[in-house]
Every structure is written in C-alpha cells, then in structure tokens.
From Swiss-Prot:
Domain MSP: 2-109
Organism the protein comes from: Caenorhabditis elegans
Alphabetical list of Gene3D superfamilies matching this protein: Immunoglobulins
Tissue: Expressed at higher level in testis.
Protein name: Sperm-specific class P protein 16
C-alpha cells in the first residue's frame, strides 16, 4: 500500500495562487485519505477527505490567500478504505491511518 504526491512539493506566490497535485495510489487496495495543513489561515485544500482507487489518482488543489512568505506543510494521512464506505469524511473517523505523505509548501515573495 503506497500513496505518493506529484509534484511532491508546492511553491506558490505569497501574494496568493494555487497549485494542483495528484495523489497517486501505487497499490492494489482502494485508499481513503484526510489532508491536514500546518496553516489553515492562508491555505485552502480541496478535497480535504477522499478516496483513491487502486492504481488510480486524485487531484488536490492547494490555494493560498495573500500573506507573509512562510514555509508550511500538508500531511496526507491515508489508510485502506472500508469496503462499504461512500462518505470519506464519515468513514475516515473509523479507520486507523496506515501512513502519511508530507507535501512541503513554500510561499515566495
């Protein structure tokens, strides 16, 4: 079971901007994920919860509002998805994360 981010890091202007990343499931099991941010004031993540099909990918959009240049990070917690799960946010509460992927975020002046 593996989950990777492509590209593996995010650089956006401190004045605001967005970046699209793919979460790629390299395994044979459907995965469920939750994304946590070290800076919820200046970053918006869509989606926060979701599923990634076996050998599939899911686009994640990172949007930054204007603010001082700063280093932050996203941590994607993931686990095998429950077989009957349809609501990722509700289902994630019932699983134990099996791994994480960290995406460093850099806001540049």
């Amino acid at each position: 079971m593996s989950l990777t981010a492509d590209p593996p890091a995010c650089t956006v202007p401190a004045a605001g901007g967005s970046s699209t990343h793919k979460l790629v499931n390299g395994g044979a099991d459907k995965l469920i994920f939750k994304i946590k941010s070290s800076n919820n004031n200046e970053y918006r993540i869509v989606p926060v919860f979701g599923f990634v099909d076996p050998s599939g990918s899911k686009d994640v959009v990172i949007t930054r509002t204007a603010g001082a240049p700063k280093e932050d990070k996203l941590v994607v917690h993931f686990a095998p998805a429950p077989a009957d799960a349809t609501d990722a946010q509700a289902a994630f509460a019932a699983v134990t994360p099996a791994g994480t992927v960290t995406i460093p975020m850099s806001a540049t002046a």
